[in-house]
């Protein structure tokens, strides 16, 4: 396993056999030859074999109207381990890695996600069995899967982001519009300090945040306001009443306030998308097959 990971990653072995074999801590290079920890950990359950057998797995869509084929490696896993992983929740990824001793390659699948997205829906009483066969896509190779593993490593930080923006969103609902700008500045400063922005799925939101920090208005609000100005409307006359605003305010003000709240609403939706869709990444599911085409 050590030879398959980047040399800067630190691997700690658990000597007692409680189902988890390795704690892999991810590091990154800060300057020439110097590495620092990213504060990201992934747990591994490692199995080995001298005889990898690749099989076809037919997977159907939710409506059973279409299907796809995955090339997988099957491995029987004790349900006691799966039950332990399920109790852990999904914040700390536990990856099953099957190592081919002949080809010196490892194949992985995230057990937390496999349980939630596949196993419980197909076998809700799986814990009554002695073992469950896990289907590991052969595309999930350790040697070429650094990006995927680093994505799993960000999970705890992403969950922290989800909790933070949801809490901030509730606070903003009870913040008067006269105090909103000061509160938003504090909130955005906190969000920007989170180590999550290398995730390409968040690129659009980081661009919107950077735009607000520079212009003190969201990009969408400026588009709406400029369109109104081009139509000859007076955007600064206080004749409007709007959601989140007290008394009569200008079209400019009400638009900036409403679009700012919309930005937080959109950031909160990311957590729903992550749970519903993104956690199927690298799993043998129809959704991942379609997304990965």
Regions found by a protein language model. Give the residues of each.
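Long, low-complexity, intrinsically disordered terminal regions
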Residues: 149-293
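Generic alpha-helix signal with a bias toward terminal, lower-confidence helices
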Residues: 17, 23, 56-58, 118-120, ...
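Catalytic centers of nucleases
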Residues: 1-62
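Short intrinsically disordered coil segments
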Residues: 37-39, 59-65, 111-114, 125-129
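Detector for Asparagine
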Residues: 31, 50, 64-67, 101, ...
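Mg2+/Mn2+-dependent nuclease catalytic core
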Residues: 51-80
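Mixed-charge intrinsically disordered linker/loop segments at interdomain junctions
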Residues: 72-159
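Generic detector of well-ordered alpha-helical segments enriched in charged/polar residues
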Residues: 2, 82-83, 185, 206
């Amino acid at each position: 396993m050590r030879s398959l990971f980047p040399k800067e990653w630190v691997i700690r072995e658990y000597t007692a056999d409680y189902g988890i074999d390795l704690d892999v801590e991810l590091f990154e290079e800060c300057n020439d030859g110097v590495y620092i920890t990213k504060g990201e950990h992934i747990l591994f359950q490692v199995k080995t074999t001298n005889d990898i057998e690749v099989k076809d797995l037919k997977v159907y869509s939710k409506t059973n109207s279409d299907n796809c084929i995955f090339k997988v490696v099957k491995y029987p896993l004790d349900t006691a381990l799966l039950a332990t992983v399920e109790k852990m929740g999904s914040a700390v990824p536990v990856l099953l890695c099957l190592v081919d001793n002949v080809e010196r390659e490892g194949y992985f699948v995230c057990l937390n996600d496999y349980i939630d997205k596949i196993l419980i829906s197909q076998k809700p009483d799986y814990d009554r069995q002695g073992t469950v066969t896990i289907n590991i896509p052969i595309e999930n190779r350790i040697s070429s899967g650094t990006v995927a593993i680093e994505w799993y490593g960000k999970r705890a930080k992403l969950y922290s982001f989800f909790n933070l923006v949801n809490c901030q969103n509730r606070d903003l609902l009870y913040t008067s519009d006269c105090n909103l700008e000061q509160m938003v500045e504090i909130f955005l400063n906190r969000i920007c300090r989170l180590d999550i922005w290398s995730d390409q799925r968040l690129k659009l939101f980081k661009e919107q945040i950077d735009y607000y920090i520079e212009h003190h208005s969201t990009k969408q609000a400026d588009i709406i306001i400029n369109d109104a100005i081009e139509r000859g409307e007076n955007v600064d006359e206080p004749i409007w009443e709007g959601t989140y605003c007290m008394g009569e305010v200008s079209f400019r003000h009400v638009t900036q306030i409403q679009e700012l709240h919309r930005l937080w609403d959109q950031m909160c939706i990311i957590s729903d998308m992550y749970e519903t869709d993104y956690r199927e990444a690298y799993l043998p599911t129809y959704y991942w097959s379609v997304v990965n085409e």
